[in-house]
Structure formats: C-alpha cells, structure tokens
Regions:
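Preference for solvent-exposed, low-hydrophobicity sequence contexts
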Residues: 1-205
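Extracellular/virion structural assembly segments
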Residues: 2-12, 26-28, 126-138, 169-178, ...
Length: 322
C-alpha cells in the first residue's frame, strides 16, 4: 500500500488537496480511507472506495480552514506563528505525509516569499501596526531587519514549525520622531522581501480597516477621510382602528470613507475590500467585523494616481417602538 501526497503545503483549497493511492494489489478491493486532523487526532471524514486498485482522492471538502484568523492589536514588533491546520490520510496502518493548509487563496511557490496584495511602498500612521504573512518551508528560520530614519534598528529571529509566520510591525517600537521604516525579511539567510513605510501623524478623521485579500493575507490601510456618517431607518406601517402606526422599525448606521490619492497598485489592492469575505474596522483599540455595502468601485486603469470610496455598515438592528 502506498499513499502519496500530490499537493504541496499551502495549496489553496479551491485547487484541491490531492493524494494518490496505490494498493499494489493484483485484484481490486474495498478500501476505507480516513482523513485525520493532526493537531486533534480527530477523524474528520471517512471515504469508502469500492473495487479499487489505484485511486486519487481530494480531501479539500473535509478540511477546516483555520477560523482564528483576525488582525490582532500589537504594541510591539514581533514574529508569531500564522494560523494553519495539518492533515494526513490513513488506510489501515499506513499513513501519508502531512499537508499544511491555511487561508491563502493564491498558489504558493516552493520558494519562500511574503504573501501580500499591497505594494512594498506603504504608509503607516503613528501608533499603528501592519502585518506581513510569510510562507516558507516547514522548519525554516526567519529574520527581520527594521531600520528607522532616526538611526534605530531592530533585528528579529524566528523559527517557524508550520512554514507560515506573521511579522507584526508596530511604530510604537520606535522613537516618536520616526518618519520612515525600512523592513527587510530573510529566510535561512536569503532575502525574500523588502518594504518601505512612510510614518506620518494620524489625523482625527480617519478609519483603519483590515481585510482578507484575494491572496489570503490580512492587509491594513487607514482611510484618510470619514466624510459622511449616515443613519437610516425603515419602518413598516400598518393601519389600525386607531389610525396609522409603525409596526416595526429597522435602523442602520453606515460610514462613507475615502482613500488617499494612491498609485494604481495600491488602488487595485484596496478595491479587493469590496469582495473580501472578511473586513474589520479598528474601533476603540480593537478590531470589529463590519460589512462593506459598496456595490461598485471605480478607479483608473491607466496608471494615474486615483482614490476609491467605500461605504461601511457599522451596525443594523431592530428598534423597539415602545
């Protein structure tokens, strides 16, 4: 009996997580295949393959995407393990190699790299943080070198057992006078990414969003202007013997946001917010899920800097009428 893993670690689930099975028998037989989550030892699914000598199975429909995946407030610059899940296939006493899955939705190459939709030149406001998702081989050592324009520097080292790690970058790790940060990330001594951050004072009329991008990384951006707040209500009116009254009322509060004028690469990344499965807004120091109600985002396709507008629903609820 041979079980061969055909899919690499961090294969997007929509592409399938494939295993090849060869019983090495001369005649077909029924095979019971167990799909096991390694962290818990739980058998998440069982497949019965009838009259089989060789088969290919896709375990993606039974895989649970890591659910604890949200932007976390960080007051310090640090590495941490990114949420992942590991699975294996068992037939009798024979087990396959394990496969690691995460929330990434784009194909991961074999070489280590930083998974992000935003360009390498970015903006950070005072007391904000950004996070970078790094995908590499299991058991790799990551290094980060952060150099500030004030002359400060910070060097971090991190061993990732799963092959996925997050670098949280906080402006609070540096002097208040910092105006620029240059971040270089290495894996096993080879450079895999560099980023430049312009650090500026934060204005009052701003809103910081985080969202799960098309590639599966959590991106951050502070919208420069929350230029309109809107509260609307929809009433259901009924006629009674005493006259016309409101039977129910549903209220909603939303916020309209405008980005900075940005280059095309940044605008294209921000446009993904409209179709993102998860969008958060920073409120009172914590991250809260919000709904994007913008049906359409328009921007320039010809390279000129432009901006986008978003409408965010903060809450919607039934309002008591007595």
């Amino acid at each position: 009996m041979k079980i061969k893993k055909l899919s690499s670690d961090f294969t997007p689930l929509h592409e399938g997580v494939i295993f090849d099975i060869d019983t090495e028998a001369t005649s077909p037989s029924d095979i019971e295949v167990k799909i096991i989550e390694i962290a818990t030892g739980e058998i998440v699914a069982t497949q019965l393959l009838r009259n089989t000598v060789k088969a290919t199975i896709n375990i993606a429909p039974y895989v649970k995407i890591p659910t604890v995946y949200a932007p976390a407030p960080q007051s310090q610059t640090t590495f941490s393990e990114a949420p992942t899940s590991s699975y294996k296939v068992r037939i009798g006493d024979i087990e396959s190699e394990s496969v690691v899955v995460s929330v990434n939705r784009s194909k991961v190459d074999s070489s280590p790299f930083v998974l992000t939709a935003l360009p390498s030149s970015r903006r950070l406001f005072k007391n904000e943080n950004d996070e970078l998702l790094i995908v590499t081989d299991r058991g790799s050592t990551l290094y980060a070198e952060i150099v500030a324009d004030t002359g400060e520097s910070l060097h971090l080292e991190y061993f990732t057992s799963s092959g996925a790690a997050t670098l949280s970058l906080s402006t609070q790790s540096f002097e208040t006078m910092v105006r620029a940060l240059d971040v270089t990330i290495y894996c096993d001594e080879g450079e895999i990414g560099s980023f430049h951050y312009k650090v500026t004072p934060r204005h009052q009329a701003t809103a910081r969003l985080a969202w799960l991008s098309d590639c599966g990384a959590i991106e951050h951006y502070t919208f420069a202007t929350s230029y309109r707040a809107k509260r609307s209500a929809k009433r259901e009116i009924v006629a009674t013997s005493e006259g016309v009254v409101s039977a129910s009322c549903r209220a909603k509060q939303s916020l309209s946001l405008s980005s900075h004028i940005e280059p095309q690469a940044t605008i294209e990344a921000l446009a993904q917010i409209a179709s993102s499965p998860k969008v958060w807004m920073e409120i009172d120091g914590g991250w809260h899920l919000v709904e994007v109600v913008t049906p359409l985002i328009e921007y320039n396709l010809f390279g000129e800097p432009s901006y986008i507008l978003l409408e965010i629903c903060l809450w919607e609820k039934e309002v008591a009428l007595w």
